[in-house]
């Protein structure tokens, strides 16, 4: 089943799936989606967590497969996270992921979360991805387009009780902000958090925003 990222919060309020697949090339949004799923799972008693990163074609999937079936009747519920940075699990991984997808159906003791980069059409039609999507919830995480970034910044400011001045000045402020972070959501996120520390809830002037983000650092997510 496919669920839009914007609808994830509503979905989690209704029900928690035993299997989630997050795929896309925006690290901040993927991390936030994973955090939301984890928080909901913890609130429902999933207290244990294990994480696996698939590095190369010779990855040993046996530990991942064993993790999902290792709980006894009286053990704590667990979250099993599988990261596949390349988006290519390989032949053994394809078989393993199909097994994981099948075992997830009706499983109320293990929540599995598979995290992938942006996938091409051929990969999405492959057997392993179809099995994951068919037995769980698939969430495609698209980047924020450059033209949408000012509005995204405004929404994030609103979440912490802040807003820019209304009218043309506010639009110039948001555009300046977007230009400074150069489309980097991680940088934008950190600058928005900085504004919450520097200024109380309420209206932000153009001068306040410019002073805060004028020297914004350039972040490379692969070096964090």
Segments the model singles out, each with a brief description of its role:
Residues 1-224:
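Conserved beta/loop motifs at nucleotide-recognition and modification sites
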């Amino acid at each position: 089943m496919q669920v839009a990222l914007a609808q994830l919060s509503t979905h989690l309020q209704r029900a928690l799936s035993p299997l989630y697949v997050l795929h896309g090339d925006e690290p901040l949004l993927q991390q936030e989606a994973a955090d939301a799923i984890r928080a909901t799972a913890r609130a429902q008693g999933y207290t244990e967590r294990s994480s696996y990163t698939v590095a190369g074609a010779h990855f040993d999937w046996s530990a991942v497969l064993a993790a999902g079936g290792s709980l006894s009747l009286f053990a704590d519920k667990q979250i099993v996270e599988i990261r596949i940075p390349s988006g290519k699990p390989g032949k053994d991984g394809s078989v393993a992921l199909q097994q994981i997808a099948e075992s997830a159906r009706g499983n109320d003791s293990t929540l599995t979360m598979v995290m992938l980069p942006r996938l091409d059409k051929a990969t999405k039609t492959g057997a392993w991805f179809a099995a994951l999507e068919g037995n769980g919830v698939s969430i495609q995480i698209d980047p924020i387009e450059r033209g949408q970034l000012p509005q995204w910044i405004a929404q994030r400011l609103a979440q912490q009780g802040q807003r820019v001045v209304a009218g043309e000045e506010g639009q110039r402020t948001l555009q300046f902000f977007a230009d400074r972070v150069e489309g980097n959501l991680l940088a934008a996120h950190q600058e928005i958090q900085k504004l919450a520390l520097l200024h109380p809830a309420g209206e932000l002037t153009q001068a306040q925003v410019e002073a805060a983000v004028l020297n914004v650092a350039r972040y490379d997510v692969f070096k964090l």
